[in-house]
Amino acid sequence: MRVVSTLLLLLICSPAIAQDYPSRPMTVIGTTSAGISVDLITRYFGERIKTATGQPWVIENKPGAQGSIAAKAAASAKPDGYTMFVCPSGAMSANQYLQKGLPYDPVKDFTLVARMFRLDFVLMVNPQATPAKTVVELTDFLKSKQGRTTYGYFSASMQALAEQYLHLAGIKGAPAAYKSLAQMMSELDAGEFDFTFTAAEYGLTPNPKRRVLAIASEQRSQLLPDVPTLTEAGLSKALPLFAWFGLCMPAGVPDVVVQKLTPIVTDIATRDETRQFLKTFAADPFPGDGTALAKTQQETSRDWAYFVKLANIDPQ
């Protein structure tokens, strides 16, 4: 009876919601700390959604646990259209394989509104420590080390990509885990390991201690047009992997709310000014409605099942 009553209430209230929504500020839950690229991009979208709706985004950053803390908070929120979640691929596709006792269901606990943007990863070396200009040269160099290969990683995505490369190249290597991306990049500059997969934005600025050999996406980036994909670089069986972000809401949000927000978010994602803004972070627009986001989530989840098995990652 309670479920039936809730459904009847939503049906009765939906016309009013459609007419008045949003009538007050909207809370947006983020997975990162304030001031970093994902947070700044979120605020960019928020300002334009405020212009379109007349109501501001109030951002609540809840970093930690690869996005699980934020995802749990969003999933537990009241589905009234006033709590949103800038949902990352890690929380929506990867964590189910990486974490024991996940405190939310990435499929059942959310309503998917729209895709927003994506971030790519690149294969990078310190040329002063690893004298390779191509992936083929890197493979030859690492094989010459006879089992003494090391790589650095900060996130599960970086670890998965590194293990895929080693597997396809027929090389064994030891990982070095870091607590922050900044720390990992500092250690790369110091020549503490042989290679890493890192955020593409680190490849935008020339640096004598950093050389990009390939990009882990399905096609070349317009920001790094001379950098080949892993497939083009000789790893024909490499699966692409990138970080995507979408707008999600708690399960049970009225359809009229989604129908109002989806075209607004999609319009922002397709603007030329958005593409230009995202270039600053080596990010790309990733427009699409909730159906497109669901398909992307399913595909990424399938790929993560492969990566976790390949990298022999045990859920923690």
What are these language model-derived features?
Residues 1-9:
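Sec-dependent signal peptide recognition
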Residues 88-89, 127, 199-201, 217, ...:
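Short secondary-structure boundary segments
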